[in-house]
Amino acid sequence: MTLWPKRPIIYEINTRVWLNELTRKHQRPIELSCVPAGEWDAIAAWGFDAVWLMGVWERSLIGQHIARTTQGYLDDYRRALPDYTLDDVAGSPYCVHRYVVDAHFGGTRGLAAARSELAQRGLKLLLDFVPNHVAPDHPWVINHPEYFVQGSRDDLSRAPNDYFDTYGGHILARGRDPYFPPWPDVAQLNAFNPALRSAAIDTLNVIADQCDGVRCDMAMLMLNDVFDRTWSNRAGTRPNVEYWREVIPAVRGR
């Protein structure tokens, strides 16, 4: 593979939607390992430098339940797609249960096959990383609650939309942008926690082994100034080094 151009042209594909469309088009189940060669050829013919397969990671069942039962979301679906059904609602691709390729898409082997097809056509592969939050059923919630912004019983009583009970002895904050209400389907990671930063590096190394570049969702939320403004005294001691200045070199230099 050649080096990245200075200003790459990237084609985003909603992986779930695309595979469903191909399944209907070809009238057989299509996952990443068996996308017809002509489909890859058509993408390559457009002259892009890379393909971003958005949303390949395992989605959360809790997140899916929230997406299927929150009235405001249901109203939005109906306005956008009057004929939608609940089977169409898979949950947010940014509510990541685990950084494992979803079995519905062909799993790790399917992704490797897709990457190979792209490489044969001179295209690079981008995948997602969500540094700010994970799903409420991500293994870290139970195994490493210290990675998250913590709350108290009083916080939960005062602001039940801002916090949730893990039922493992911890109250955690829901993920958020400082200018909007919290997202109901994710848990807020603590960018100031050294152990979380180390775990993020490990996660990124796993992702990097499977692609040529990473698209980092809501990357600005991990900046010290932004995180401090959002979480102030709940985040602990502000580090001297920015999150990305610690994480990116560690992944690039491995």
Spans of features found by a protein language model:
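Active-site and adjacent substrate-binding regions of carbohydrate-active enzymes
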Residues: 1-254
